[in-house]
């Protein structure tokens, strides 16, 4: 009888070519989200490693967002409409478990209300303050902002959360010495340098860290004249609109890169 030889196919393990799932990122904010979107659309910052959604509202509608039943929700039909327009994904509310990472951007935590008075006071002849007093003042300022409290709640619920504050006013748009802006009342702050600002940035970071939130300070190389953002970061049309608050897509890209660096 002829011998029959059967060829046996050996199975070899082949590593999967599928990529790991992207992390999900939600950027929560107010009108400053506009510069983030323009930066993303222009390819100024790379978020290819994330499935990203924007969430928030502009103007008065942002004040109608609140923490209700454990989620950040709009409290009026107008605010719901504003949120859905910005989000574009039909997400009317966000909860701590909805995303891998949250970044609160701008969100009314205004550095122009914190830095000038603090730096001015610290520059007075008898203006030195203790670390404990600085910590208490910083915590009072941070917790006075609703979005910061929401960020802390999310972190307390187990979410990975970061906060990038509203940046300092833009230089070169108006004459701050003549304009009716509170920053003109703190002239000593205008001479502050990076070492003088450092304790304030650290106090902000410490306050957020105590609640489990990462803090993204405004990069020092974007700051000039003590308490101002450099003029080249003004958005298009800022001079005509006298807009010292909002920033360009290039500035948003700088902040987003700082945020991404902090993730690593």
Located regions from the model:
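Basic, amphipathic N-terminal segments that precede the first structured/catalytic domain
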Residues: 2-97
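Short catalytic/ligand-binding loop motif for oxyanion handling, primarily in non-cytosolic enzymes
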Residues: 34-37, 61-64, 110-115, 169-175, ...
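Short amphipathic alpha-helices and their capping/turn segments at secondary-structure boundaries
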Residues: 38, 82-103, 146-158, 207
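Oxyanion-hole/transition-state-stabilizing segment in secreted/luminal serine hydrolases
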Residues: 87-138, 168-175
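Surface-exposed cleft-lining segments at the edges of enzyme active sites
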Residues: 118-148, 182-195
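Acidic carboxylate-rich catalytic motifs and surrounding loops in phosphoryl-/glycosyl-chemistry enzymes
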Residues: 165-167, 210-230
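Substrate-gating cap/lid alpha-helix
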Residues: 173-218, 244
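Histidine-centered active-site loop/cap adjacent to the catalytic His
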Residues: 234-264
